[in-house]
């Protein structure tokens, strides 16, 4: 669709010029908000994520997925070890990570995502907060306890906002990693989502295919709110 000749995403850096990678990433993220993609995602949530994750419906997912392209040619750009809580995600949501490139080999460690077990994550995150550690200090503290996620296309890692995760180091494999991550939350915990509120950052997933069809049959919002009058904007509410 974008005009690049590419058979293996692991070699994306050879097909896409460096100064165009951001444009590709931005377009892929935007495409995840298309109706076709959202419907496919919601079906995946109902059929796979909810039962596998033992989640209670209704659930909400974020509106735009995060598509990540981790190049081997930009050693200064990588994802530091962190928790979702540090990035403003509430305790009630969970993260999902899906690799689109195979990172199962030991030598893929620096281009895969790494994660720490939940008990150690809670312990070391609190230790870092109490001592107000810098990013470099946290990286050195967390690194010995990180485990490589060995997975490939079709795999999914579901984890909490308390898990410490990230790449933590430059990609030195000579191959690109492409992945997608997003968040899901059970509706009953809507007040525990931090600043990622339903209706804004997240939207509810219809619980059945019938409900999905009914929503799809509704008139578009553009037509619904078009009354021929000018829009009104409130610049201040006192």
Annotate each language-model stretch with its function.
Residues 2-16:
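N-terminal alpha-helical interaction blocks
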Residues 76-151, 193:
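Catalytic core of non-heme Fe(II) oxygenases with the double-stranded beta-helix
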Residues 50-57, 103-112, 173-175, 210:
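Intrinsically disordered, low-complexity coil segments
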Residues 13-74, 79-91:
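Signature of the catalytic double-stranded beta-helix
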Residues 58-66, 95-99, 109-115, 158-160, ...:
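A structural signal for short, well-ordered beta-strand segments and their strand-loop junctions
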Residues 67, 72-74, 86, 101-105, ...:
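Short, solvent-exposed loop/turn segments at secondary-structure junctions
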Residues 120-238:
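Conserved double-stranded beta-helix
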């Amino acid at each position: 669709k974008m005009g690049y000749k590419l058979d293996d995403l692991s070699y994306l850096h050879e097909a896409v010029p460096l100064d165009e990678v951001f444009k590709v990433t931005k377009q892929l993220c935007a495409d995840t908000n298309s109706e076709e993609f959202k419907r496919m995602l919601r079906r995946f949530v109902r059929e796979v994520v909810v039962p596998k994750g033992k989640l209670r419906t209704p659930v909400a997912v974020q509106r735009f997925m995060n598509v990540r392209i981790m190049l081997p040619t930009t050693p200064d750009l990588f994802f530091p070890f962190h928790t979702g809580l540090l990035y403003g995600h509430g305790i009630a949501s969970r993260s999902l990570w899906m690799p689109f490139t195979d990172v199962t080999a030991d030598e893929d460690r620096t281009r895969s995502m790494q994660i720490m077990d939940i008990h150690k994550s809670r312990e070391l995150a609190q230790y870092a907060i109490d001592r107000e550690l810098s990013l470099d200090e946290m990286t050195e503290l967390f690194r010995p306890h990180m485990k490589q996620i060995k997975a490939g296309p079709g795999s999914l890692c579901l984890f909490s906002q308390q898990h410490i995760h990230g790449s933590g180091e430059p990609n030195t494999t000579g191959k690109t990693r492409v992945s997608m991550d997003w968040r899901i939350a059970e509706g009953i915990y809507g007040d525990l989502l931090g600043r990622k509120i339903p209706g804004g950052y997240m939207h509810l997933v219809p619980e059945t295919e019938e409900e999905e069809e009914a929503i799809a049959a509704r008139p578009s919002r553009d037509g619904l709110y078009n009354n021929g009058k000018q829009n009104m904007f409130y610049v201040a509410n006192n």
